Amino acid sequence: MKSRAVALVIATTAVGLLATAGSATAGQGDTFCTWGGTPAAPTGIITLNPGITNTPSTGPIQFTATGPLGGSGCTGKLTFTGSFEPGATCAVGSAFHAKATGLPPVTRVEGQPSIAGTGPVLLYDAHGNVVGSEQAQFLTTLANESDPGYLNCNTPRGLTEAFWSDTIELFASK
């Protein structure tokens, strides 16, 4: 069972990295940032209340995801504060909505349903315009058995904290 979970996390992370790398040629003049470190050295932290388990949630799950920004023109700390819609599990995430602080002009985000902690996220400005995207990788270290979150999805309390990293693309102004 452990080997299947590890294989799923590794495969999903690889798909997320390929999707992010594939978008790197999307637009001339776009800005690319790291957020929460790298997959090899994640520094982002997400906290979840209540914790996510392997049973679909019956209500929203509140979360805060925060981490340092890196890359050319990307400094400071970005934070998402929001909630996952009912139905979230550790393996299949539900859509989410969040307020964003720390990366102007981004003020809010909308995440799509995801598999194993990776999923597309659209970044919006205060006027409702899409100004960027990011590929969430919330379960970056769960393949590591020394990670405290490794088995928490199987407990009644669930996964309440995890490390992650991802890449952000801010679209060039037209």
Stretches with model-predicted labels:
Residues 20, 27, 67-68, 83-84, ...:
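Processing junctions and N-termini across compartments
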Residues 139-174:
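Extracellularly exposed regions in secreted/surface proteins, prominently low-complexity, repeat-rich
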Residues 42-138:
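Predominantly extracellular/secreted and cell-surface proteins with exposed
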Residues 26-35:
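Cleaved targeting-peptide boundary
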Residues 35-36, 71, 168:
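Extended beta-strand/beta-hairpin segments
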Residues 1-26:
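Secretory targeting and sorting signals
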